Amino acid sequence: MERIKGFISTVRLMVMALFLRLKAGSWDKVVFHGKVTFEHWRDGQLLYTETGTNTFTTEGMAKLLNIIFHDISKAASHIWYVGIFKNNITPALADTGAKLGSGNAYGECQDADYDSPLTNRPAYTTEDTTTAVITNVNAKAHFVMNASITVYGAFLADAAAKTAATGTLMCAKRFGTPRAVIADDEIYVTYQITCTTS
């Protein structure tokens, strides 16, 4: 009888452990994955392309949560912009918009570095989605270079001006291979953001 009770106790513990494991299963999580594709063109020829994951900042994730679940409204027009940077820096979770702009940690590229578009960063132009993926693949961020520099990476921020060191840095990516560009080279950046439960 004691052996049967012990067996039943063991089974009960196993069932409870399984229940707790299932309760904490992958479907109760929401994870954002950022995939960045970088293209470097010269004279109409694709010189280099790479795709990799980026770092979502704490500041950026807080912005998402506040728009979705709190009281921060989202602009009716573009809210995110793509920028590129020329300092040898690896994006970190604690990075903020204060590291962008002219002369700050990221060394954001300015009009002297790329002159199309002038003044402002290109908009992150997406389309309505009915899936868990949003991307600017049909309207890639396009930069026409104006100088011989090395481009180290790209980012998403919510301020339009290249000089802006305010607002939110959503995410950033240091390229696996920094690119030495010259005047009239073209850079295209595609950001794909996936929301998943795993």
Task: Pin down the residues of each PLM region.
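Small cysteine-rich, disulfide-bonded extracellular modules of the LU/uPAR three-finger superfamily
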Residues: 1-152, 158-198
